Regions:
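ATP-binding/phosphotransfer module of carbohydrate and carboxylate kinases, centering on a glycine-rich
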Residues: 1-58, 62-66, 70-107, 116-127, ...
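Short glycine-aspartate micro-motif
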Residues: 80-84, 137-139, 199-203, 211
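Short, acidic Gly/Pro/Ser/Thr-rich loop/turn segments
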Residues: 88-90, 145-147, 209-210
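Short, well-ordered strand-loop elements centered on a beta-strand within folded domains, enriched
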Residues: 94-96, 105-107, 151-153, 210-212, ...
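Hydrophobic beta-strand positions
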Residues: 98, 145, 213-214
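Glycine-rich phosphate-binding loop and adjoining helix at the ATP-binding site
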Residues: 105-110, 114-188, 284-293
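Short secondary-structure boundary segments
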Residues: 142, 202-206, 274-275, 303
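Glycine/GP-enriched mid-protein hinge/lid loop-to-helix segment characteristic of carbohydrate kinases
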Residues: 174-266
């Protein structure tokens, strides 16, 4: 059973979440949508405006001769720093983005280079935290897996086995979330938004092995060690150290993975993230025909060929950060 203080904080959280998602609303509208009594809403709105977490709208709403004030989320009450590591056009790229609570970018900068190690990463993050003091959490996307606090199976050798979360938290004294790139991308795709609850994303960089992001029943599927989606370890007799990243070889691997994906997960949508050019319509038709031949009795997944990995990746990382802040954890080290 929730204690009164816990219930109060939960109601505040619900009000802020509704305002962030739906925009400006009056007290009566907030009460109607949340199911919280008007009396309680009045008290909570007062608290939230005093703390500047929400703002009164300048253009209040007219209601039958009276003017009912509307309220909106304060988008700059907290900021989220998103750091994404990615292979982009055959270069290793670090992207630093600062977003407000409405997902509007306050700052975006991309850096590329093979020598961007943990020291350079810490320096850039610290500079941004100093420049944007409203940053309340940092979300980092990596092409690898965090196990036991260390980055494992990393495509970027300079960060392999680094205690990334612990190191950055110690540097800036802020909560740090670390997420796999493909998990973030598939959450970003879901947040476009789309209706499907079962989505698999297959990501094919130009010089590194592929990975997968799995959204099952609306939830990211990670597995016990976070290894779900590490498709480079599939027993398909592929030597990734000497792999020829040609269009034909990538297409052949995708064909196998689409069939395996259907067998393992039976998704509603399969998103193929790649910058390789296949001739989108023809290739998707070929994949669908192959699935139909194997599963003539099944409703087949929609197959989407997308070049928007970077966009979905950032959106997904931001979604992880917003979700963290909305949960209003008081001790982020727990």
């Amino acid at each position: 059973m929730a204690l009164p203080r816990d219930l109060k904080e939960l109601n505040k959280k619900n009000i802020k979440s509704i305002l962030r998602q739906q925009g400006a609303m009056t007290k009566a509208e907030i009460a109607d949508v949340t199911g919280i009594s008007v009396v309680t809403v009045n008290k909570l709105i007062r608290d939230l405006t005093e703390s500047e977490e929400i703002l009164e709208q300048d253009n209040s709403v007219a209601t039958g001769g009276r003017r009912a004030i509307s309220y909106q989320i304060n988008p700059n009450y907290q900021l989220v720093l998103v750091v994404s590591l990615q292979e982009k056009w055959k270069k290793i790229t670090y992207s630093f983005s600062v977003f407000n609570l409405l997902g509007e970018p306050e700052f975006v900068e991309d850096m590329s280079g093979e020598d961007l190690d943990i020291t350079a990463l810490k320096r850039n993050i610290k500079d941004l935290v100093c420049a944007f003091p409203k940053i309340s959490c940092i979300v980092m996307g990596v092409p690898g897996i965090e196990i036991g606090g260390r980055l494992r199976a990393m495509d970027f050798p300079l960060l392999l086995n680094v205690h990334l979360r612990e190191t950055v938290e110690a540097e800036v004294n802020l909560p740090v979330l670390v997420e796999t790139d493909t998990n973030a991308a598939i959450l970003g795709y879901k947040n476009r938004p789309v209706e499907e609850e079962n989505i698999v994303g297959l990501y094919y960089p130009e010089r590194f092995p592929p990975g997968a992001g799995l959204l099952m029943n609306g939830e990211i599927l990670k597995g016990r060690n976070g290894l779900a989606g590490e498709i480079k370890h599939m027993p398909l007799q592929v030597d990734w150290d000497n792999f020829d990243f040609s269009v034909d070889e990538i297409k052949a691997h995708i064909r196998k993975m689409v069939l395996l994906t259907m067998s393992f997960y039976d998704p509603e949508t399969i998103v193929l993230y790649t910058n390789f050019y296949f001739g989108q319509k023809d290739f998707i038709e070929e994949l669908t025909a192959e699935l139909k031949q194997v599963y003539p009795y099944a409703t087949l997944p929609k197959i989407v060929l997308s070049r928007k990995f970077t966009t979905d990746y950032r959106i997904g990382l931001l979604a992880f950060g917003i979700d963290y802040l909305e949960n209003n954890l008081t001790d982020w080290r727990i």
